[in-house]
Amino acid sequence: VEKKDKYNKHHLTPFQALMISTASRFGIGNIAGISAAIVAGGPGALFWMCLMAFLGSASAFIESTLAQIYKTKDVFGFKGGPAYYIKNGLGIKWLGSLFAIILIITYAYGFNGLQSYTMTSAFEIYYDKAGSNITFAQSGLPIGIGLILTAFTAVMFFSKSHIIGKVSSYIVPFMALTYILLAIIAIVLNFKEIPAVIKMIIESAFDFKAIFGGFAGSVIVIGIKRGLFSNEAGMGSAPNAAAAAHTSHPVKQGLVQAMAVFIDMTICVASGMIVLFSQAYLTKQTGV
């Protein structure tokens, strides 16, 4: 039986922590990232991305379990993550602080910038097709998109973790299930192509030239890089959400977060099948 305390109203449930971490995993890495991986490495990159998910789930389990073990508690709930277990577990305070600073900079200027760039690029494609005399940059749409994203980010940033958890627990399942449903429809409509697509993935994954031809750009390396970018296993972001969950045993949250990697893999496979059915990768357009 879990011990109840006065801070429970600020705690995340294991499901809410799962949805927060899934929200960070479900994004451009699952859609544009898949397209870029297939264009750069061929259909076989999808195979290595899936294989990386099995290895990544172990990383997700370990980092989330450690986040639960070394978390701390205050009046706003639980706090933890890699910075905390580096400091409290390894006893290296400066390294934990450095990790926290690098993670903040990476997400503020790297991941968020890539998300907004991809969204803006998608709008630009359709804007150019409309044939307007005003360029996309002059239209003010890029600034408008940036302001909208900034507003949503600010709301989440200044909200308490349990509020973010509640919002994510409603939005993320709907978002993920809707996308998977659309992918299933696409697969059903192209049912006859499934054997050929699977054969193409396997042959490309183990093609000698694709594996060893310029190893830094080989199908294996591309698949692994895109897989890690998509599922975020071992990157140190998901454990921050995992630490905020109120659970009876650290391992339970570790298992929940490991499952999130397989949810991400399912969405990646769905995106990959859509790209391969359409043969859009042959145009060398990455969608980024």
Describe each region flagged by the PLM:
Residues V1, T118-F123, G140-L189, I194-I202:
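Membrane-interface loop-to-helix entry segments
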Residues V1-I31, V75, H246-S248, K252:
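Membrane-interface "cap" regions at the ends of multi-pass membrane proteins
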Residues V1-L12, A36-L46, A58-L90, Y281-V288:
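Flexible loop linkers connecting adjacent transmembrane helices
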Residues Y7-L12, G42-L51, Y84-N88, I92-A100, ...:
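Membrane-interface alpha-helices at helix entry/exit sites of multi-pass transporters
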Residues H10-S21, I92-Y107, I145-I148, A210-S230, ...:
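Select transmembrane alpha-helical segments in multipass membrane proteins
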Residues R25, I34-G41, A67-K73, I104, ...:
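Helix-loop junctions at the membrane interface of multi-pass solute transporters
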Residues I62-Y70, V75, L182-M200, F208, ...:
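Extracellular/periplasmic helix-exit of transmembrane alpha-helices
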